[in-house]
Amino acid sequence: MAPRIEPQEIETYWNIFSTRTNGGQFLTGEMAAPVLKNSGLRDDQLERVWDLADVDNDGNLDFEEFCVAMRVIFDLLNGEYADVPKVLPDWLVPESKSHLVSANKAIRGQEPKMERVEDEEEEEGLKDGFDWYMSPEDKSRYEAVYREGRDMRGEINFEALSDLYNSLDVPDTDVRSAWNLINPNASQTINKDACLAFLHILNYRHEGYRIPRTVPASLRASFERNQIDYQVDNQAAKSRWATKADDETSTGRKAKFGDQYLTRLGRSGFTSKGTDFTTTKNSDAEWEEVRLKKQLQELEDKLARIEQGVEARKGGKRDSKPALVKRELEQLLDYKRKELRDLEEGKGKSRTGSNLKSVSEDLQTVREQVEGLESHLRSRQEVLEQLRREIEEEKISR
């Protein structure tokens, strides 16, 4: 199963992001610096993480890019990477920015070439004349099928439509041929535009037309930027889909494409599997917890190596230095474990913030009391001055 950002992580990242941006949509380098530097990574590593996450190169991080940066940092701290990766893994690329990543790869000459489907032996009884144009009715039907099989990232895999394949008059080899045609990179999932093209090919094959062997250049480009021009070369010619089907023909007697599948499926069968960037929680202790766990793992590894070394000295003179080091490491390990427990239970240092808040509230109360007393003192002094003036005036009048 491919890795992904879990909803709990997204919730934590969202609270950090929303707190730093005060409800804004972008995080500047100045805003992000305190959070990122708390990870303990070197500045040069953080710079590379920033460049990696800033997919659109606008100098800021939106929420999806911030999630990418945080996940890369956590993976570095947890030992998933020895150093900052040079490119983002495919599963970590935000859906909304996949076209930018593809464009950057194309500029660097890393874009996989579109494969041409090999010519196969022509099947008897199939017709030529495949048309890439989609009528509004067909497009609507394709979108309904897509909605029932997509995951939360808006992508769809081959097996998600297995029930549809069973309802069609299309051989399995042709189904896979159509899939390979619109998925030349052999990805596990495809986006909406590629899915609609895939369903369109299956529709034509279901109606007795041969599967095309190539995809027009305009459609290939559209797949990469997630925008598809369904009317290739802006041709306005009438499509055969604009005319009413003849129910007397063998093709017309077939069930309309996807009708059986959609009727049988129902919308209640939809389950989400992808990363959802809409859920939201916050914890400044995340970095500390990760660091403590990493230190614990390092200490346990050191202890294991020392114990192996001691065991290797069978019958030899026991060196007191490894034993002393082992005791010190065990004590440090116990201390770190206690710190981690206190952190998880909200005890010890983790309560410093709440104590400071209580002291701050007490100080504010004292300030208010002092201000009240000073105000009362001023009013009494004014009364005293008034009495003194009246006494002086009385003396003068006598």
Swiss-Prot record:
Broad class of the protein's primary localization: membrane
Keyword Membrane in annotation: yes
Keywords associated with the record: Actin-binding, Calcium, Cell membrane, Coiled coil, Cytoplasm, Cytoskeleton, Endocytosis, Endosome, Membrane, Metal-binding, Repeat
Entries under Pfam families matching the protein: EH, End3
Gene Ontology molecular-function annotations: actin binding; calcium ion binding
SUPFAM superfamilies: EF-hand
GO process terms (BP): actin filament organization; endocytosis; endosomal transport
Keyword Cell membrane assigned: yes
Entry GO terms, CC: actin cortical patch; endosome membrane; plasma membrane
TM stretches of this protein: none
Gene3D superfamilies: EF-hand
Ranges where the record places region Disordered: 343-363
Superkingdom per UniProt: Eukaryota
Coiled-coil stretches noted in the UniProt entry, renumbered to this chain: 279-398
Domain EF-hand: 41-76, 170-205
Ranges for domain EH: 9-99, 138-226
Protein task: Component of the PAN1 actin cytoskeleton-regulatory complex required for the internalization of endosomes during actin-coupled endocytosis. The complex links the site of endocytosis to the cell membrane-associated actin cytoskeleton. Mediates uptake of external molecules and vacuolar degradation of plasma membrane proteins. Plays a role in the proper organization of the cell membrane-associated actin cytoskeleton and promotes its destabilization.
Protein name: Actin cytoskeleton-regulatory complex protein END3
Species, as recorded: Podospora anserina (strain S / ATCC MYA-4624 / DSM 980 / FGSC 10383)
Annotated gene: END3
